């Protein structure tokens, strides 16, 4: 076989294990040599073998009725990969993993979830570093020499297979397979109504040549039992530690029939495009289930269990489900929709995308261009091994359809299966586009499955395969220039814009104008940035501009919560911490819409690529870590102490060992993390002293899944932190809050100074932490600080009382400064409990906190239900002025 591959200049960058040299040893040379896809995973994208048994001694004579299967799929699909600088996730637990800067990151810095913008430029086979990535958490470190895959359950010969055994003892299968995330094109659904998923564009699809051992061979070698023996499913589990379900691995399952069916080509893959798997793609071994949602293809595979039932893993039930459109998150939880088998996603549906014309592409109109032919292009795919047999384009809303030319580089398998995407193209006269308002495409497969005209919204935003529509507008790009045709895609990946965004803005404006007198003004981002102060605080959420200045004094979290994002697009952070009710309230403050300026490069979301980052030598780290409230500060987990079944003490190191956190007493921070692909932010108050250098401590009560019927999923952030390994990073942001203790009875509340000689403190559960900070500050300034503190602290049980040892010790050492009274809902031995049982009643408050008089301030922090009733009504009975002398953190 002879193949011409254009070589990049710097050959050193083409080392097949360059991206994993530190954490991984090279694969054994004899294993690499067996692949017909020569070279590394970086450049072997040029070479594609057909679906076949790769070992000559294992091939069937009739595997290749059409001739030599070692030929390439055509040099015209070969793209010059070039040499690009890999980037690392600095400041995260995945800092050791190299990833392509070409990928558009969709969920922040970590974990990596990204798609390739210049998808079709690389042809039929996607270069490994540019293959789309879907990670739920940190990337496990693997070692070929020590890694094993356990095969257990309903098998007669359970065993732990080494990587050498998988690669040498089983006939190798090698074939190209297109992987697609079931959430591909999800951003289109999110423009209609927000789903539970993040904004995939149309690029969550990639194709590689995978090599591995057939799963059916492995199961037969281990003696898989029959259906009569109870074997109905095969379950898979990866190695990564994830927060879902209170802490688990990623797991899922397929039916036994699919696992053992030789026509389905299910494999345990250990090579991709002729080289070892890269860390982000599952090194050293992953599952490949062709034609299926990639959510079944477990990476970093560690366990295979033949079982009588499908996987009970959290991610098997809470991901890759296509629920009916009427089911929202509350209904899904309340009625158990997650567990209904008829809504599980396995085979992918039929889909197609337009890549040419690109988004913002402009075609001038003149006497010459109107005589030209314009070639439209795109790609299409289907699931279940079905061949895409037809792609059609309409220029008139579906009244008439034009048949496209198909390009199928893939050859069918021995059993007639097609596991890969194909390309389509069609020539149209430019003059025909002048009367066209919209271009739409649809594909058909061999079972005559096609794409619906409109999308079907569903809770997880899965299986978006409606017609892909590109709007056509006659416009003049700049004053004085000639008119032409401008094309607009439905959405832009990880950027504002697209005709669906404009449509949503118009619909929202129509609804809002009926209820308010808001003008539909348009603002640029540069105008918004000018309004970033207490005098004028604007924010952008989902493309709308809001003037929140009037709400600064009323925000429950204080003005800081708004000012920290004033002048910015804070869509992701707003969605991460606000309820639907808060989102409705926001409409009151809408003043217009955000517009993007012209002059953008005329390229599609699938063609745009981010510019390489410009690295500057930064100044020395500031003494205060939280020197800029608008910036997130990466902090590394350096210690984790288990204090009880559900209480943890976490110590996080600051970026510099000489820094202090810089959090004023009474304020809090946001801890930020990407959990299941979505930003999650929660407020915490450190328990460490504000003077601590180099680190801070968080005391966290973990709310586990299925322990509270009202919140069956438990706490997203607390479970995430509980599963976080030492060495991992989280981002913190702050300070925030409207209460600050400045010492010796002095407070600043909503920006106004306040003096208090007596503090009536009421805390519930983990709400003790900001009050604990105030107590700590008062007692640290003894004997100068004369403030008297009276604390009533409520919990469910005695074991739930946080920081009790410290509180009791301080109360004993400073009886004139601090008095503590506990209230619990239930006790083990009533005769041994000297405090109150039940709820915080008026009698408890009258006995244990001071009544209202000059110099008394009530500080509250706890669950809203507790604060609203009984605390506030009872304090009001004690003559406390709720709008003056009562403050909630």
Curated annotation (Swiss-Prot):
Entry binding sites for FAD: 682-685, 699-704, 711, 716-718, 766, 769
EC top class, in one word?
oxidoreductase
What sequence ranges are listed for the domain Cytochrome b5 heme-binding? 520-595
Cofactor(s) listed in the protein's UniProt record = FAD; heme; Mo-molybdopterin
Recorded catalytic activity of this chain's protein: nitrite + NAD(+) + H2O = nitrate + NADH + H(+)
Residue ranges of domain FAD-binding FR-type in the record: 630-742
Start and end residues of each stretch annotated as Disordered: 1-20, 52-73
**Start-end of Polar residues biased regions:** 1-14
Q: How is the cofactor bound?
A: Binds 1 FAD per subunit.
What the entry lists under InterPro entries is as follows: Cbr1-like_FAD-bd_dom (IPR008333), Cyt_B5-like_heme/steroid-bd (IPR001199), Cyt_B5-like_heme/steroid_sf (IPR036400), Cyt_B5_heme-BS (IPR018506), FAD-bd_FR_type (IPR017927), Flavoprot_Pyr_Nucl_cyt_Rdtase (IPR001709), FNR_nucleotide-bd (IPR039261), Ig_E-set (IPR014756)
- Give the record's keywords alphabetically: Disulfide bond, FAD, Flavoprotein, Heme, Iron, Metal-binding, Molybdenum, NAD, Nitrate assimilation, Oxidoreductase
Q: Which residues bind heme?
A: 555, 578
Q: Which PROSITE patterns match?
A: CYTOCHROME_B5_1, CYTOCHROME_B5_2, FAD_FR, MOLYBDOPTERIN_EUK
Q: This chain belongs to which protein, by name?
A: Nitrate reductase [NADH] 3
Q: Which species is listed as the source? A: Zea mays (Maize)
């Amino acid at each position: 076989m002879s193949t011409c591959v254009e070589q990049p200049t710097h050959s050193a960058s083409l080392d097949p294990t360059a991206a994993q040299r530190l954490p991984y040893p090279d694969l054994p040379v004899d294993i690499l040599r067996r692949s017909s896809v020569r070279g590394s995973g970086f450049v072997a994208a040029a070479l594609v073998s057909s679906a076949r048994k790769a070992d000559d001694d294992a091939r069937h004579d009739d595997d290749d009725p059409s001739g030599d299967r070692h030929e390439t799929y055509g040099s015209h699909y070969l793209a010059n990969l070039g040499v690009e600088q890999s980037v690392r996730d600095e400041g995260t637990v995945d800092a050791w993993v190299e990833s392509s800067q070409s990928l558009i990151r969709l969920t922040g810095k970590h974990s990596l979830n990204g798609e390739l913008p210049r998808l079709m430029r690389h042809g039929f086979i996607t270069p490994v570093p540019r293959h789309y990535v879907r990670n739920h958490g940190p990337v496990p470190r693997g070692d070929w020499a020590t890694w094993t895959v356990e095969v257990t359950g309903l098998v007669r010969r359970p065993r732990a297979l080494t990587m050498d055994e998988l690669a040498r003892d089983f006939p190798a299968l090698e074939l190209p397979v297109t992987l697609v995330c079931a959430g591909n094109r999800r951003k289109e659904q999110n423009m209609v109504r927000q789903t539970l998923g993040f904004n995939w564009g149309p690029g969550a699809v990639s194709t590689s040549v995978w090599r591995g051992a057939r799963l059916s061979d492995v199961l037969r070698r281990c003696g898989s039992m029959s259906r009569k023996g109870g074997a109905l499913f095969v379950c898979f589990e990866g190695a990564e530690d994830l927060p879902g379900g209170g802490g688990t691995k990623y797991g899922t399952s397929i039916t036994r029939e699919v696992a053992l069916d030789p026509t389905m080509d299910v494999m345990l893959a250990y090579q991709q495009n002729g080289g070892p798997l890269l860390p982000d793609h599952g090194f050293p071994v992953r599952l490949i289930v062709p034609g299926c949602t990639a959510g079944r293809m477990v990476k970093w595979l560690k366990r295979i269990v033949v079982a009588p039932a499908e996987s009970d893993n959290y991610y098997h039930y809470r991901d890759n489900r296509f629920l009916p459109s009427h089911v929202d998150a509350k209904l899904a939880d309340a009625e158990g929709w997650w567990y209904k088998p008829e809504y599980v996603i396995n085979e992918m549906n039929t889909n197609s995308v337009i890549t040419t014309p690109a988004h913002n592409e402009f075609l001038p109109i003149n006497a010459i261009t109107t005589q030209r032919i314009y070639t439209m292009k795109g790609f299409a795919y289907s699931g279940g091994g079905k061949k895409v047999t037809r792609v059609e384009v309409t220029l008139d809303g579906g009244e008439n359809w034009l048949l496209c030319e198909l390009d199928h580089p893939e050859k069918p398998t021995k059993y007639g299966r097609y596991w890969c995407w194909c390309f389509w193209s069609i020539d149209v006269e430019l003059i025909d586009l002048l009367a066209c308002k919209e271009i739409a495409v649809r594909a058909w497969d061999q079972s005559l499955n096609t794409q619906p005209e409109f999308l079907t919204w569903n809770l997880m935003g899965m299986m978006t395969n409606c017609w892909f529509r590109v709007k056509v507008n006659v416009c003049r790009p700049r004053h004085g220039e000639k008119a032409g045709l401008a094309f607009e895609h439905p959405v832009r990946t990880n950027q504002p814009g697209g005709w669906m965004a404009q449509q949503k803005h118009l619909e929202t404006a129509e609804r809002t104008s009926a209820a308010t007198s808001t003008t539909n003004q348009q603002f640029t981002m540069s105008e918004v940035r000018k309004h970033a102060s207490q005098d004028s605080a604007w924010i952008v959420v989902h493309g709308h501009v809001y003037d929140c200045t009037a709400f600064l004094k009323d925000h429950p979290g204080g003005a800081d919560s708004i000012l920290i994002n004033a002048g910015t697009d804070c869509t992701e952070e707003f969605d991460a911490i606000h309820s639907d009710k808060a989102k409705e309230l926001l409409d009151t403050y809408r003043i217009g819409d955000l517009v993007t300026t012209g002059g953008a490069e005329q390229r599609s979301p699938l063609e745009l690529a981010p510019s390489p980052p410009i690295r500057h030598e930064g100044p020395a780290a500031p003494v205060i870590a939280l020197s800029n409230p608008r910036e997130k500060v990466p902090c590394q987990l350096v210690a984790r102490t288990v204090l009880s079944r559900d209480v943890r003490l976490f110590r996080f190191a600051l970026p510099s060992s000489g820094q202090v956190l810089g959090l004023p007493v009474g304020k809090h921070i946001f801890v930020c993390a990407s959990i299941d692909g979505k930003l999650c932010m929660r407020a915490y108050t450190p328990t460490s002293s504000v003077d601590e250098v180099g680190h801070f401590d968080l005391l966290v009560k973990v709310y586990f899944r299925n322990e509270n019927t009202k919140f069956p999923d438990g706490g997203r952030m607390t479970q995430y932190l509980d599963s976080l390994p030492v060495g991992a990073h989280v981002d913190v942001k702050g300070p925030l809050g409207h209460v600050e203790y400045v010492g010796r009875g002095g407070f600043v509340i909503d920006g106004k100074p306040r003096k208090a000689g007596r503090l009536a403190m009421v805390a519930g559960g983990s709400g003790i932490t900001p009050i604990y900070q105030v107590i700590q500050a008062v007692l640290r300034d003894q004997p100068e600080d004369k403030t008297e503190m009276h604390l009533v602290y409520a919990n469910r049980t005695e074991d739930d009382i946080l920081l009790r040892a410290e509180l009791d010790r301080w109360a004993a050492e400073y009886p004139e400064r601090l008095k503590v009274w506990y209230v619990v809902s239930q006790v083990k031995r009533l005769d041994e409990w000297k405090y109150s049982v039940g709820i915080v009643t008026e009698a408890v408050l009258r006995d244990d906190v001071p009544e209202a008089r000059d110099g008394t301030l009530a500080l509250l922090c706890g669950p809203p239900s507790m604060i609203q009733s009984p605390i506030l009504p009872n304090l009001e009975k004690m003559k406390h002025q709720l709008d003056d002398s009562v403050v909630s953190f």
